[in-house]
Amino acid sequence: MTPDEITAIDTAHIWHPYAAPGSGNLPVVRTHGVFLELADGRTLIDAMSSWWAAAHGHGHPRLVRAAHEQIDRMAHVMFGGLTHEPAARLTHNLLALTGGADGPNYSRVFLADSGSVSVEVAIKMALQYARGTGHPERNRLLTWRSGYHGDTFAAMSVCDPDGGMHSMWQGVLAEQRFAPAPPVRGASEDERAAYLAEFEQLMDDDVAAVVIEPVVQGAGGMRFHDAELVRGVRELCTKHGVLLLADEIATGFGRTGQLFTTLDNGVVPDILCVGKAITGGFMTLAAVLTTDEVAAGMEPSAIMHGPTFMGNPLACAVAAEATDIIAEGDWREQTRNIETWLTQALAPARNIAGVADVRVLGAIGVVEMAFDVDMAATTQAAVDHGVWIRPFGRNIYTMPPFVCTEDQVRQIGRAVVAAAEAAAAAHKDTQEQDQ
């Protein structure tokens, strides 16, 4: 197909995520390393890691080899009543990566199709555990605002009910309990203590589990908070006999500069969701990890959830290799370097009118504006600098592949700063037109 034919069919017929039909989309013909090649010949740095998944860049040779070798043997087989080596190898790796000095923290793994599905399954686990341990009245969940956990119905029910993207579903979704958004990184000890006291007031007898994104809230606002707060929530869950469900789909596998933002800070969730970078961005897969205690308490012990492509051997083989790469540890130096380079490269954004905050953690960089940004203007400004980003709400942000060079990260920084300037200019124009 020609680029024009692709665009014509796309515009006329294809729905894209979080977009109305007919929205403009750039045709991509090839990816390699940190780059996207467009149909018109332009090359862009993928500063989003294709929605935070391609941590090792596109087309990593070890992942390509794993995919080729597996597809020649077995691309798919049902997971009901059958098993296979890729699933066993991946499970072994996940249990090892999430283990501590005293041994494994987890003993059970559910392989899901996507991050949203993993949260859905984790919620089922928590509710089944409550019933199985004699607490059927525990049928609600507690979370904090500004969170995002996915687009399926149970996952949507624990996303921010007002400021999130699922507010249209109020009255249809299960009603959960919401604490205020957590105090941001750098909050005082007194602020954290006051927040945790308020959080505890919501831990009524009907709460089965607390659901949080630890340290970084992703698509709900790219907000950072301190690990001490997560430790405080863990203590409250233990005190009240409530399960802690941690969504590390975005943060897991090194994105923040830590392997996992819970475990690396001394917090062991009862249920842990991981995904995105689990396959290095090759294909969709996620996992839910839990303990023997939770598994034994569930009634019935079977989880009534069975996706057609659960445990897909092709996805598992690639994920096993991707988690081998993570286990080798190069991501530690890579994310330390990216954090340094992004901090320097994004600093000029602080001088732009309308910038509310600039923050960096590991391989995450955020420029937050004081107003909702014009997505078209900001995206185009970055593309003009040879970089692909996807702003949302007030946030212009980047989660680059770990394999980016210093020059590439600095180019990303210049593009994000240019996007912030474009957002400020577009906002000013809108204000002047409204006068």
Label the model's feature ranges:
Residues 1-435:
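Conserved N-terminal phosphate-binding loop of PLP-dependent enzymes in the Aspartate aminotransferase
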